[in-house]
A protein has these predicted regions:
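Alpha-helical transmembrane segments of multi-pass membrane proteins predominantly involved
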Residues: 1-416, 432
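Active-site-proximal region of nucleotide-activated glycan assembly enzymes
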Residues: 2, 413-442, 446-453
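A short helix/loop element that forms part of the nucleotide-sugar donor recognition site in Leloir-type
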Residues: 453-465
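Small/polar loops that bind or transfer phosphate-bearing groups
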Residues: 59, 171, 421-422, 466
Length: 466
């Protein structure tokens, strides 16, 4: 296993464990044995997905996770949950078809079932229409997993209708794994055909199209979130917007930007999981998840209100929390990678991301205003003094993690950077054989020529020290 797989296997297990701790699960689920068995199947599929570069195994592992998540979405057997599960299944089936067809086209072009083999085939000559069509279909399929616009239409209904534990697994663990798969495809298999989304020097490739997808996701997610009267649906559109932020970093096609995106997806998962836990607790007590249901939360349950403050301000990117560190790292890395040529680079996309982040403050603060400023109705003004341990863990651990990662981001950023360091190490070994670094790319035991940038000076210094 490479460092990236090891890190994200631990991340998926941690997020899955926190999802199990969500307080309402036992009340919503009549058959907990079957429910937690499906959760284990879903986690198994996600764990297998993080560590593979084999196209067929990747599809099988993703579908193992997806089929389990479809069932988990409707497990509470309410009308709303049934609708959520059906929509999730239908959209998921279409996305799986796109993904499988795309993988088959890529295999037909490269005659290899591994991403390393795909990269070798692409480096041998110009990409064929088969490879281009295959990559487009793969991005569409993974866009569904990440809830990127316009492939996000399943998300609001699933977030609102599914049991809280299921939603947490979809929102946190599944999104993290989807990003890992996308990073592997773009940074290993299709790195040599990235093109450029720079404003002053746009080149054909996947980067400009990913930049457009990022812009659409950010605008759709943030604008539609403004009109929501359900906090769960608000978090669903927030997920769409945050997928856009992640794609801003990937559009730069740099190791440091990809590392920042991987850091942020973990932070996003913790913040969203914690916000869902607080929302589920409020929904259990008040009967609905409207922003008005949060009125007076600071008086009813001060610790939940403070935790909600941490979660939503982290999602909004307010310092000194981990959400700010993640967004700053992504946007600054995207700017640094894309302006090396002397053009304005991704200034247009990063500027749009900053504007959309400012807009997101409105709907996050509207919920916090209810929790901290508004008075609760007398019928709801009951102190929460008997919270179970699982409730404390589901809300408290993510809140503490966001504060710690905000103050000490190197705890997670440094291990993630080892993925980039390993890539640079491979290039360095090939340079020792007399092959120019800017014309080489190595993955595992394979070496081939491609047009890639030389390792960053900081990475070269780390390699020299090692």
């Amino acid at each position: 296993l490479d460092p990236l797989a090891r890190i994200f296997k631990a991340v998926v297990l941690g997020l899955g464990l926190l999802a199990i701790f969500l307080p309402p699960a036992r009340r919503e689920i009549a058959q907990p044995g079957e429910f937690y068995a499906l959760m284990l199947f879903a986690l198994t599929g996600l764990l297998l997905t993080t560590g593979t570069n084999h196209l067929l195994f990747l599809f099988v592992a993703l579908e193992l996770a997806s089929l389990s998540l479809y069932l988990l979405a409707g497990f509470s057997r309410t009308a709303r949950a049934a609708e959520a599960s059906l929509k999730y299944f239908l959209f998921g089936g279409v996305s799986a078809a796109f993904l499988l067809f795309g993988l088959s086209l890529i295999y037909g072009f490269s005659h290899s079932a591994t991403l390393q083999g795909v990269a070798v085939a692409l480096a041998a000559g110009p990409p064929s229409p088969l490879a281009i069509a295959g990559l487009v279909m793969v991005v569409v399929g993974l866009g569904f997993k990440l809830a990127a616009a316009p492939f996000h239409y399943w998300a609001p209904d699933v977030y609102q209708g599914a049991p809280a534990t299921s939603v947490a697994l979809v929102a946190a663990a599944s999104k993290a794994v989807g990003l890992v798969v996308l990073v592997r495809f773009l940074m290993i298999g299709f790195h040599s055909v990235s093109g450029s989304a720079d404003w002053g020097g746009m080149l054909a490739g996947w980067s400009p199209w990913l930049a457009v997808l990022a812009a659409v996701s950010m605008v759709f997610g943030n604008v539609l979130a403004l009109a929501q009267t359900s906090v769960r649906r608000l978090l669903a559109y927030s997920a769409v917007a945050n997928t856009g932020y992640l794609m801003v970093a990937l559009s730069a096609n740099g190791v440091s930007a990809a590392g920042a995106a991987l850091f942020y997806v973990v932070v996003y998962g913790l913040a969203t999981l914690g916000a869902l836990a607080v929302t589920a607790a409020v929904e259990r007590d008040c009967g609905n998840d409207s922003p008005a249901a949060f009125a007076g939360l600071i008086h009813r349950s001060p610790w939940q209100a403070v935790a909600l403050l941490v979660f939503l301000t982290s999602l909004a990117g307010i310092p000194p929390l981990a959400g700010f560190v993640g967004k700053f790292a992504m946007f600054s890395a995207a700017m640094a990678e894309s302006t090396k040529s002397g053009t304005p680079g991704l200034t247009w996309l990063v500027g749009l991301a900053a504007i959309m982040s400012a807009i997101s403050l409105y709907y996050y603060l509207s919920v916090l205003k209810q929790a901290f400023v508004k008075e609760a109705p007398e019928a709801d003004a009951v102190a929460d003094s008997t919270a179970p341990l699982s409730h404390l863990l589901a809300i408290g651990l993510p809140a503490v993690a966001l504060v710690v990662l905000g103050l000490f981001p190197a705890l997670l950023l440094d291990p993630i950077d080892r993925f980039g360091v390993q890539t640079a190490l491979d290039r360095d070994r090939l340079r020792a054989l007399g092959v120019p670094a800017e014309k080489t790319f190595v993955t595992g035991n394979l070496k081939f020529e491609a047009t890639l940038p030389a390792p960053l000076p900081a990475l070269e210094e780390m390699i020299r020290i090692i």
